[in-house]
Regions:
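Stable alpha-helical elements in mature extracytoplasmic
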Residues: 73, 77, 109-116, 142, ...
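Solvent-exposed loop/turn segments at secondary-structure junctions
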Residues: 66-70, 94-97, 137-140, 163-166, ...
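Catalytic His-Asp charge-relay segment
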Residues: 174-180
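Primarily recognizes the serine-hydrolase "nucleophile elbow" in alpha/beta-hydrolase
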Residues: 130-172
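Serine-hydrolase catalytic machinery in alpha/beta-hydrolase-like enzymes
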Residues: 30, 37-50, 55-124
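A domain-start/cap signature at the N-terminus of enzymes
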Residues: 2-59, 105-108, 138, 194-198, ...
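C-terminal catalytic histidine-bearing segment of alpha/beta-hydrolase fold enzymes
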Residues: 179, 185-232
């Protein structure tokens, strides 16, 4: 199976994940919880916002970490998750270096994200029409690449300082938020976002783009703007 066929099948599978009745969901409390799906050192976390109740459906943001990191490193989103009211799912890449498509091609990470989504649906009341896929650095590259191929599942894509864009297929038409520091030495803006954004707009995507004074790090003001863009 080539990567196009794999991702097309994955998009269909993600879109078809079952809806879990409220009575079937396990109890979950606000705060950070381990996923307990993967190996001890490569698993991930789910963050439940303050005030969470299963009586209503909540937006979901799947946030992907950068190279050599884990899902715990997306904790910069947790305070805003409390403020705006969103569940954060942060899986670990299967390889400790980075996400699969940046190494060999789509495969184990897509499968694990799918399993983590199913696990989250089992635990939380998620509003399926308000789901975003996002990340920073390599996580941004992966969310941008995978998000274009799973737009029927993720209606919004958030990419903080992406370095590559490698979609294997196109499904749906997600709205896209991209930001990049103009002095980024890791993923220089002139060969990344300044090329990606015009290309995406020419393909008909609704793209919000922000450049800011800074390097490769995530800035709080831009993260807040992304939350507002997605949730308000």
């Amino acid at each position: 199976m080539n990567r196009r066929e794999f991702l097309a099948g994955t998009a269909t599978a993600l879109a078809g994940l079952p809806t879990i009745a409220r009575a079937q969901r396990s109890e979950v409390s606000p705060g950070q919880h381990d996923l307990k799906l993967g190996e001890a050192d490569r698993d991930g976390v789910i963050y439940i916002p303050r005030g969470y109740t299963p009586d209503k459906a909540w937006p979901l943001m799947v946030m992907l970490h950068g190279a050599g990191s884990t899902g715990r490193n997306v904790s910069y989103t947790f305070q805003l998750a409390d403020e705006f009211g969103a569940v954060i799912l942060a899986p670990d890449s299967r390889h400790e270096a980075t996400w699969d498509v940046l190494l060999t091609g789509y495969g184990p990470d897509v499968e694990f994200i799918g399993a983590a989504l199913k696990h989250t649906y089992n635990r939380c009341n998620i509003e399926r029409k308000r789901m975003a896929l996002g990340g920073h650095s390599d996580g941004a590259s992966y969310s941008l690449s995978l998000g274009i191929g799973t737009g029927e599942t993720f209606g919004h894509v958030i990419a903080f300082s992406p370095g590559v864009m490698k979609p294997a297929e196109v499904h749906g038409k997600p709205r896209i938020f991209i930001s990049h520091g103009i002095s980024d030495p890791i993923m220089p803006i002139d060969v990344t976002s300044r090329r990606f954004v015009p290309r995406l707009k020419n393909l008909g995507y609704d793209v919000t783009y922000r450049e800011y004074e800074g390097r490769h790090g995530v800035t709080p003001a831009v993260v807040r703007e992304a939350f507002e863009w997605f949730l308000r």
